[in-house]
């Protein structure tokens, strides 16, 4: 992953923080900025995941642009740890902070928002929250929730896969965490595509919890179980898709069995260019990591009053880009070769409609 757009994050001193009489897990911080400036905090799943590593890079870029202390919290897929680490930062900063969080699971969002409200901090959530939890119920501290509609993109990747298979054959599918909103929506998109394509048979669907290791194990088992019956592999994210590609390489079938993912990470785009994957969807995690902080920071510093913003600024879909063999090279040249240059003041520029709940 030492490639241009995913060189990783700069080294930062790992420090320990105390909360509720116990020591929370380490977080990564950039120190030495003005005491009056709010600390900006990204809470993500893992720095070893290329998607979240790029999210973190965007957060660091925003923090540098405003001269703020930057803290990265890593949950490693542990909800209790994620919530405890955020509460520890709230205690450490006295609430003088902005938090941009991708909750490990939907139920995690509520205690996080409630803790931020109680501490006077400002928070933006992304991807996961309960449907009945809304920013306007926690004014002004719960600034916004950002997501991407998983159904159309899950369906688009299934359709790209089916096209690469010639419209017939068997597929296996790798899903995310069961109670995770994006995982549920992307699976629904897959189901819709399957219903519309009678020539495609779903051989098996297994949850791999967004993890490459689990996806590799499941794909290897499938290759043994189903053999040549597998004509394609659909994965709910790129990490799992790339694990499937790795299994296919070992089996001598990479490039022969198309694979699709979602996230638009560099390795996935490169795999599409090589012909080992058929598609992915780019969310721009650099934008997510930086703009989520920027929205919260602008609210915290008084640039706008969240309570006066329309609901389609409080809960909104961002914009994804479908990448296939037709546009992978041009996307790579425009978005990966060099570090993105974003206007951090354009906080509503990618609003793509208010989130709808079924």
Language model regions located:
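Extracytoplasmic "Venus flytrap"
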Residues: 39-58, 62, 66, 70-85, ...
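Hinge/cleft segment of the Venus flytrap/periplasmic-binding protein
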Residues: 36, 174, 178, 193, ...
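Flexible loop/turn connectors
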Residues: 254-255, 260-323
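N-terminal secretory signal peptides
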Residues: 1-13, 17-27
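Hydrophobic alpha-helical segments within soluble ligand-binding/sensing domains
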Residues: 82, 144-171, 215-216, 264-268, ...
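C-terminal segment of N-terminal export signals and the immediately downstream linker at the start
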Residues: 28-41
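Flexible loop/hinge segments that line or gate small-molecule binding clefts
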Residues: 112-152, 170, 265-273, 277-278
């Amino acid at each position: 992953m030492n490639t241009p757009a995913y060189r990783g994050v700069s080294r930062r001193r790992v420090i320990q923080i105390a909360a509720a009489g116990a020591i929370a897990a380490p977080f990564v911080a950039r120190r030495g900025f003005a005491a009056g400036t709010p600390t900006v905090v990204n809470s993500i799943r893992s720095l070893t995941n290329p998607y979240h590593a790029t999210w973190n890079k965007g957060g660091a870029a925003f923090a540098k642009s405003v001269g703020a202390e930057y803290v990265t919290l890593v949950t490693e897929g542990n909800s209790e740890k994620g919530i405890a680490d955020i509460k520890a930062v709230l205690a450490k900063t006295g609430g003088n902070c902005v938090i941009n969080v991708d909750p490990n699971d939907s139920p995690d969002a509520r205690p996080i928002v409630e803790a931020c409200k109680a501490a006077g901090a400002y928070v933006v959530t992304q991807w996961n929250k309960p449907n009945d939890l809304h920013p306007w119920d926690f004014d002004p501290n719960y600034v916004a929730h950002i997501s991407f509609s998983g159904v159309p993109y899950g369906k688009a990747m299934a359709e790209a896969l089916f096209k690469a298979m010639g419209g017939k054959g068997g597929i296996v599918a790798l899903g995310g965490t069961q109670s995770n909103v994006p995982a549920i929506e992307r699976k629904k998109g897959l189901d819709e595509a399957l219903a519309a394509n009678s020539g495609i048979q779903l051989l098996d669907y297994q949850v791999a919890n967004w993890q490459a290791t689990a996806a590799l194990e499941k794909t290897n088992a499938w290759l043994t179980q189903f053999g040549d019956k597998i004509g394609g592999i659909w994965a709910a994210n790129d990490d799992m898709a790339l694990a499937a590609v790795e299994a296919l390489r070992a089996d001598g079938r990479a490039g022969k069995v198309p694979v699709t993912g979602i996230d638009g990470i560099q390795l996935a785009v490169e795999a599409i260019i090589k012909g080992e994957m058929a598609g992915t969807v780019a969310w721009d995690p650099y934008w997510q990591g930086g703009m989520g902080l920027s929205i919260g920071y602008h609210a915290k510093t008084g640039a706008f009053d969240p309570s006066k913003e329309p609901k389609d600024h409080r809960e909104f879909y961002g914009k994804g880009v479908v990448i296939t063999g037709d546009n992978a090279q041009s996307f790579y040249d425009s978005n990966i070769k060099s570090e993105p240059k974003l206007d951090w003041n354009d906080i509503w520029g990618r609003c793509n409609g208010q989130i709808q709940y079924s």
